[in-house]
Amino acid sequence: MGRAVSRGVVSLFSLFMAVVPAVPAHAAPSATSGAGYRFVKGGWIYVHLEGTPEQVGFQHGALLSSEIADMVSVIKLESAHATKRDWRFYRETARTMLWPHIDAEYQQELTGIAKGVQSKGIKLDVWDIVALNAGIELPQYYVPWLNKREKALNAPHILPEGRCSAFIATGSYTKGGKVVIAHNNWSSYAEGARWTIIFDVAPAKGHHILMDGEPGVITSQDDFGVNDAGLMITETTITQFEGWDPEGKPEFVRSRKALQYAGSINEYVAIIKDGNNGGYANDWLIGDRKTGEIAYLELGLKNTPLWRSKDGYFVSSNFARDPMVMKEDTPEFNPNNLAASENARRVTWESKMADEKGRIDVEMAEQFIADHEDSYSHKVEADERSLCGHVDKVKAGIPEWNWGPYYPGGAVTGKVADSEMAAKMALVAHAGHPCGDDFHAAEFLSAHPEYGYLRPILKDMPAGPWTAFRAGEK
């Protein structure tokens, strides 16, 4: 959630330090809580959660207590800097606007997370946990809508950040006709260095889930996962989206519910559209390993077009696709600006799909999301237009997301699966830049003191190896 440095950096830093909870040393690499457990592998923390919503939540909070407190610290600083609103505002919004629209099951799970964290001596409550879960949709979607509605004077210019490069393919485009799905998460490096949890969730009701995620968050959030009904999902954010429905259901609830309860593409689409609040508006790539069908749901607020195929592909890199979405949901988005990150990456994706038709598999997908091809400059260089993004290396930044020159953000993880792996509830994941480059925080801050406000939360982001995970792993 990067933003350019403002004159209020010092006061915001003071505000951050006043509200940040004490964060104890990280929990042991391996630990248990009831039926839940955790271990470290390949730069990821694998967390198994099992049982009722309360049990799943408590295990989550207890096993990741220090990581959750740390993640809250990140979202507090980033959101305060970007929106000029303090954590009290987000806690109160979580309580008064979001909570009444959260299903009872997930209210219980969120409460359980808070209790689990508290059991380890950390002073966070359920409103901190809900605000953390809404750490994208409140600052980047609700606050711009609220500022406009209230005609707020001197309101900061807030733009939803683009997140991710992804594709899904099937039929004649893939080796053996399998569904292949791949995704890399684009975020601030402060978030990305911590977005390294593999959640194996076996709920008392619904489907078993294997997904990546953030500490304390009940959904994948960058959204890559599989369930035991054969669904394979991912998404990328829609650039320059505008809109919010205060009576809608939070996106973090709808996306978790869809992966937990959907057994088909139709069911997934119905669940994630139900109560759509416009928060964290995404293009959803959905596959069904049972049928070989894939789908692309452009989930705007006013428009929600759906495309489907049993022999083809869908690529996504934060661009709006549908003309009505562009007209009514993303009126500032310019699809003809090929120098823009989202459009340049789309050109690269289309080229790769055409060039590699019939050969796409997991190994090739790993190479795709580690790629440094720049379709606009016609060079191979890690930058804001490469599928594996490195915005910290370029003066241009990404204006469409309000990422300034050399902003410390880009591709922070990679995940890939095919339908054969999904049948075994398995995936492969790469922590850090998928290309293998490490990010060194001290070196970056020395070169770019304008981002000194991030010093309390910016840390090294080492690139781990591609690592296989499966449900029930110990």
Q: In which residue ranges do the predicted regions lie?
A:
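Bacterial N-terminal signal peptides that target proteins for export
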Residues: 1-13
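Short stretches within intrinsically disordered, low-complexity N-terminal or propeptide regions
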Residues: 6, 20, 24-27
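Bacterial N-terminal signal peptides
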Residues: 10-22
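Intrinsic disorder/low-structure terminal segments
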Residues: 12-15, 313, 318, 332, ...
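N-terminal mature-domain region immediately after signal-peptide cleavage
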Residues: 26-266, 273-279, 285-308, 335-474
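A cross-kingdom feature marking charged/low-complexity
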Residues: 294-329
